[in-house]
């Protein structure tokens, strides 16, 4: 019997998850879709799935074995807690919650469930952990193929920031991927951070300083830099280079399409992140479904990973509001 999945949120990410679960993920069936826009839910859902505008109805439905939360960031914590009350496994898109207080509430509830049952119900959608490029990079780093890592350089550029994006949201919604992946990559927690603004692009809305430049230092002493540019116009790019004692290792732009025509050679850059991380999303979903079907603990990021990223984000926001002062990350 397939795992019957209910998906909350039928926007860009939710629709992609529905499509993957319905076409490329083995052992899954989308049986219920919830979105505040009933028309959008109907457009994204497979023909046999039920539709609702009430996520609580979906979570408590006898037609649902597991839930994917792909709705607005502000809804994540509340919906995850509802899934806990229903004792339903849930895969929540990042971030765990937009505020530290909400993250702490979810982690505490998750800990209670683990204490009572021996297993967590929560998986968190930090999909880069399943990207083949990042996986290979991590294997090289942790295998010390080029000796000790010394520095890491990251670049994350988007064509255009979403409406209403602020400098704080740029950290909690976009940079949050690097705040999670760097300690995962290096096997060492982030201990201090700093944030600086670049020269302001004319395309940034009020409240957003763009581009920005961040630093993260991990407990092993490695320094990571991150350039975050949300209004780069030309498309989506993510880069990561690890500088080690005996060489460098970097991600390849595997999603670029090469075109040779009329005496020219071109590389077509994707408009957003989805083509670049399509494999990561599929692999993450399959790992989650396979674990649920086998009665095993999913290998995805969990509640504590989400809290750790939130704590680093909080320190980064504090640096943002303190003229770029280097700020310690407190895990206590």
UniProtKB/Swiss-Prot annotation:
InterPro entries xref list: Gfo/Idh/MocA-like_OxRdtase_C (IPR004104), Gfo/Idh/MocA-like_OxRdtase_N (IPR000683), MI/DCI_dehydrogenase (IPR023794), NAD(P)-bd_dom_sf (IPR036291)
Coiled coil: none
GO biological process, one term: inositol catabolic process
Keywords (A to Z) from UniProt: NAD, Oxidoreductase
Taxonomic superkingdom: Bacteria
Catalytic activity: myo-inositol + NAD(+) = scyllo-inosose + NADH + H(+)
GO MF terms, alphabetically ordered: inositol 2-dehydrogenase (NAD+) activity; nucleotide binding
Signal peptide bounds: none
EC primary class: oxidoreductase
Catalytic activity, EC: 1.1.1.18
Quaternary structure, from the entry: Homotetramer.
Purpose: Involved in the oxidation of myo-inositol (MI) to 2-keto-myo-inositol (2KMI or 2-inosose).
Family as reported in the entry's similarity comment: Belongs to the Gfo/Idh/MocA family.
Protein name: Inositol 2-dehydrogenase 2
Origin species: Paenarthrobacter aurescens (strain TC1)
Gene designation: iolG2
């Amino acid at each position: 019997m397939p795992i019957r999945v209910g998906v909350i949120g039928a926007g860009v990410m939710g629709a992609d998850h529905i499509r993957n679960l319905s076409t490329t993920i083995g052992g899954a069936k989308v049986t219920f879709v919830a979105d505040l826009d009933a028309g959008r839910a109907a457009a994204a859902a497979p023909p046999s799935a039920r539709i609702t505008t009430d996520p609580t109805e979906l979570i408590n439905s006898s037609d649902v074995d597991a839930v994917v939360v792909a709705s607005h960031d502000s809804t994540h914590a509340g919906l995850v807690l509802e899934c806990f009350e229903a004792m339903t496994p849930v895969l929540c898109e990042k971030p765990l919650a937009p505020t530290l207080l909400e993250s702490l509430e979810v982690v505490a509830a998750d800990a209670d469930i683990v204490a009572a049952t021996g297993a967590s119900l929560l998986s968190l959608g930090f999909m880069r952990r399943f990207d083949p490029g990042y996986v290979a990079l991590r294997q090289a780093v942790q295998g010390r193929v080029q000796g000790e890592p010394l520095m890491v350089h990251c670049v994350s550029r988007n064509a255009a920031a979403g409406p209403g994006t602020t400098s704080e949201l740029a950290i909690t919604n976009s940079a949050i991927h690097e705040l999670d992946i760097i300690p995962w990559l290096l096997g060492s927690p982030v201990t201090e951070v700093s944030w600086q603004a670049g020269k302001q692009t004319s395309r940034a809305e009020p409240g957003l300083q763009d581009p920005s430049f961040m630093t993260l230092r991990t407990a092993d002493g490695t320094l990571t830099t991150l350039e975050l540019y949300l209004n780069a116009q030309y498309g989506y790019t993510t880069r990561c280079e690890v500088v080690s004692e005996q060489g460098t290792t970097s991600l390849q732009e595997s999603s670029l399409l090469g075109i040779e025509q009329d005496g020219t050679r071109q590389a077509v850059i994707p408009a957003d992140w989805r083509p670049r991380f399509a494999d990561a999303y599929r692999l993450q979903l399959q790992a989650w479904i396979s674990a649920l079907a086998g009665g095993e603990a999913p290998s995805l990021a969990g509640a504590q990973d989400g809290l750790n990223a939130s704590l680093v984000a909080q320190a980064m926001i504090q640096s943002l509001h303190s003229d770029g002062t280097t700020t310690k990350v407190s895990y206590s």
